[in-house]
Each structure stands twice: as C-alpha cells, then as structure tokens.
Amino acid sequence: MKSVRYLIGLFAFIACYYLLPISTRLLWQPDETRYAEISREMLASGDWIVPHLLGLRYFEKPIAGYWINSIGQWLFGANNFGVRAGVIFATLLTAALVTWFTLRLWRDKRLALLATVIYLSLFIVYAIGTYAVLDPFIAFWLVAGMCSFWLAMQAQTWKGKSAGFLLLGITCGMGVMTKGFLALAVPVLSVLPWVATQKRWKDLFIYGWLAVISCVLTVLPWGLAIAQREPDFWHYFFWVEHIQRFALDDAQHRAPFWYYVPVIIAGSLPWLGLLPGALYTGWKNRKHSATVYLLSWTIMPLLFFSVAKGKLPTYILSCFASLAMLMAHYALLAAKNNPLALRINGWINIAFGVTGIIATFVVSPWGPMNTPVWQTFESYKVFCAWSIFSLWAFFGWYTLTNVEKTWSFAALCPLGLALLVGFSIPDRVMEGKHPQFFVEMTQESLQPSRYILTDSVGVAAGLAWSLQRDDIIMYRQTGELKYGLNYPDAKGRFVSGDEFANWLNQHRQEGIITLVLSVDRDEDINSLAIPPADAIDRQERLVLIQYRPK
C-alpha cells in the first residue's frame, strides 16, 4: 500500500507541476515563439528535412528537436500546451532515467523516488523543463548516453557490452541531431575521469567503435538528405554555430569563468542546503565506482562550459540529473545520522520565500518605487506573486517541524510558482515579451492585413504562430534570420528603414499594411522616421501602425 501511495503522490506531483498549469502561461519571445513557429511550419509544409522560420531557411540547429516539438503540436494542437508538450515529455523521460539509474546503483526504491522528485523540483530543471527550448531534449539524450555507457561497462558479456555501446552511439547521434556536436564532447569528457580511475581503457577501446558506428548510422540518413537539399548547411552549422558560438572572441553569450556558480546555487533551490554535503560526501566516497561516475558526470561538463567563452544556464541542465542522485543519497544519510543540512535547507527556503515577499511589496503599487512593476489595477497579480513566495516559505517552515520526517516536503516549495506564475506576470512584461497578448489586443486590426512587417524576430515568430501565417516581413533588422535572408529566393522578405517609404508606395494598393515595432517605454512614436500612418495602436512596448489603400 505504501508503494501505491507513493506512486499516486508522484503522479499528483507531476500533474500539479508539469501538466495542469502549462496552458496558463503565454509563450515567451524570442525562444518559445521561435520554436513554436518552426514546428508549426514543419507541420504545415510537410518538410521534415530542412528547418524553416518565417518561410526562410533556419540553420541554427539540426532537426530532431523540431520533430519532437512538431509531434507535440500535432497531438495537442497549436496551443501553449502543445508547444511545450515535447519538452515536458523529454523532462519526464529524463526523470524516469534518473529513477532507473538510481535503482541500478543502490537498489533502493525510496532513494530512487526521492532522486526523481528532487530532480523534477529543482528550480533550473522546472524552469527549463516547462519552457519550449531544445535544451531538455539534449539533456535527455546526454543522460540517456551516460546511462547507456554505465550499462555497457557493467555488463558481464560481450553481447551486453556491445548493446550498451550501440545504444550509447544512438543517443549521441540523436543528441547531434538535436543540438550539434556538443552531444559528442560532453559524454566523452564526463566519463574520462571514471574510466581513468577505474582503469577501464581496454573495454573503451575494444567496444567504443560500436558507439561511433551507431552514432554515424543514426545521423547519416538525415545528414545526407539535408546535404543534398541544402549543401551549405553543415558548413554553416559547424563553423558558425559551434566554433564562433563557443570558442572565438566574438562568441555569443560571452560570460566570465565563474558564470555557472550562481546558476548552480539558484538552480539547486529548493534543495540548496544539500548541495555542499552532496558534493563533499561524493568526494569523500570517491573510492566507490558509482560515486566517482556521478561526480564526474556533474563536474566535467561544468568545467567544460565554464572554459568556453559562450555560456547560457541551459547548457548545464544534464548535470542536474547526476546532482539530484547525489543529493538524494546524501539526504537520506543526513536524515538518519545528522539532519543539520536538512535544517539549513529549510531555513534557506524560508529566507528565500520571505525575501520574495518583501521584494514583491517593494516593486508593487504600494511600495516605495516611483515606477512599480505592477500597476494598481493588477492587484490580483501582486497577490499571486505573494502567494508564490508565501507557499515557498510555508513549506520551508513545515520541513522544520519534524525535520527527520518532513524534510522531503521541500519538493512542494515551488508549488505556488508552478500554479500561479502564469497569473502573476505584469502587463508591462506581457506587452513586450508575450506576442500572444499583443495579438489578442489587436486581433481585429492584424487579421485582415495583406502585409505585416516587424523589427523583432521573436515578435515576428509570435505573430506568425498566432495568426497561422509565415509571410511576416522583417523591417530594419534581420537578427538571426540574416543567413536565411541572403538566399535569392528570400528577396522581398526584408525591408530596410531607408527603403520603407518606396516599398510602401509600391505595395499600398494591394491591401492593408501593418507595421509592428518594438519601442522604448518612453519613446515618442511621432519621432519615428516613417510615413504618416492611418492608424496607430500602442500597447506599451509594442506599437501597431497601419497603412490602408488609398
């Protein structure tokens, strides 16, 4: 009966965090709107080989992540849940691997369940795992690869070892097809310290070639297909998306070496109090093969991405699978022997919740700020934000009431965040970051437009997805579409600021022309260097400007 109760609790936990509240959150631009529109266009066109965004070639990522996203929208429709269904599925599959791997290492069902709950409730896992980007997919393939390698190295027969390495190659191949060649580098770096300390080089060299073969065979069909359709894809993807993005002086998302320290700290909530003890206990028990493997899995990717010039929090998502297992193992030891770390964890969550409550008041309409985040008419959103932090502090306090038994309720600290964050976003944020909100407010004006132009790729993708049309024209700025716009068949999909007046005269009689611009909050629309418009509708950071036929 206890096992049944645990399973019911786990399913309720997943429903409250990963299923029920997802539709209440509008899509964020630029990331979610971009991937939503790429997958919508894939379904609409039936082209499952070459990715397109706004009808233009889009070579920033390979294809596999878009396949999964497209299946999500095909199954659940073009809605918020359908867009995020793929990443949620990948996150839950990763959690299932955490369960399986923990059971494999320690043969303890309670520990396996705890590791799963810790993983799913980690702030960084939840934030990224319910956000429609490709990182949950690559995290799943990396975690699957690490599990496959362990399975192969623990097998006692040549058939078992061969199967494990073949599976490793498939996971690496799918990782390459999801986000590129980092799916090869990260697993290799992660296992090398373990291979060295356990002196398992022989197995690696004897069977490793099977992983190489299965990886190549996994990528080859699509790799050849896109090379035939778009011969310059691999050159662009390898040089621009890998070398320039991570290594060169002009790398994207440049950040200092220590960048991931605060990411690890914030990402470990609501289990931050377990982080030092989990790592220390893991290091102290480094003579144990499994512990070394988990430590290497956690630390090596962190070091690799810290050295790289380009950094984003999402890059280290796969590290938190192994970290969750280390935390769960340490938590049970602490509960049994010395619950000090569990008490500290409770106080950290209380402090975080109280700090959030105070910060919410400071930026609320009743706080001391001259320009509050929320306006007076958004009072219910302020109370939603207060509820988020109040629940966080409450469950932090509850874990202290009988710490040896109640410490695991820290998993419920983010419950308010999961259920209420979609209702607490300020209008001033929604107007700039949620194109769906803008479309809803201006639907009647946008729908009959013959041409729609915008100066933001994220807004363009949001407009395209919401209006179910991929002919949005870029105005003044090309952004990440620069490469696709260079193709001859993309002529007419970009209008510069200097050309706009002439372009308007040439196309005005064809129908309503709508210009959607991103502006500063205090920017005077009348100062924009554009021809006089027939209608203007400003929604804070986004403004709709229309020209009708004359």
From Swiss-Prot:
Q: What does this protein do?
A: Catalyzes the transfer of the L-Ara4N moiety of the glycolipid undecaprenyl phosphate-alpha-L-Ara4N to lipid A. The modified arabinose is attached to lipid A and is required for resistance to polymyxin and cationic antimicrobial peptides.
Segments spanning the bilayer are: 7-27, 81-101, 111-133, 137-154, 165-185, 204-224, 255-275, 288-308, 315-335, 346-366, 382-402, 406-426
Source organism per entry reads Escherichia coli O7:K1 (strain IAI39 / ExPEC)
Catalytic class of the enzyme: transferase
This chain is encoded by the gene named arnT
- Compartment list: Cell inner membrane
Going by the entry's taxonomy, the superkingdom of the source organism is recorded as Bacteria
What is the name listed in the Swiss-Prot or TrEMBL entry for this protein?
Undecaprenyl phosphate-alpha-4-amino-4-deoxy-L-arabinose arabinosyl transferase
Q: Which Pfam families match?
A: PMT
The GO biological-process annotations, alphabetized, read as: lipid A biosynthetic process; lipopolysaccharide biosynthetic process; protein O-linked glycosylation; response to iron(III) ion
GO molecular-function term, one example from the UniProt record: 4-amino-4-deoxy-L-arabinose transferase activity
Residue stretches in coiled coil? none
EC number(s) of the enzyme?
2.4.2.43
Per UniProt, the keywords (alphabetical) are:
Cell inner membrane, Cell membrane, Glycosyltransferase, Lipid A biosynthesis, Lipid biosynthesis, Lipid metabolism, Lipopolysaccharide biosynthesis, Membrane, Transferase, Transmembrane, Transmembrane helix
One Gene Ontology CC term in the entry: plasma membrane
Q: In which pathway does it act?
A: Lipopolysaccharide metabolism; 4-amino-4-deoxy-beta-L-arabinose-lipid A biosynthesis
Q: What is the topology of this protein in the membrane according to its UniProt annotation? A: Multi-pass membrane protein
Q: Which family does it belong to?
A: Belongs to the glycosyltransferase 83 family.
For this protein's source organism, the top of the classification is: Bacteria, Pseudomonadati, Pseudomonadota, Gammaproteobacteria, Enterobacterales
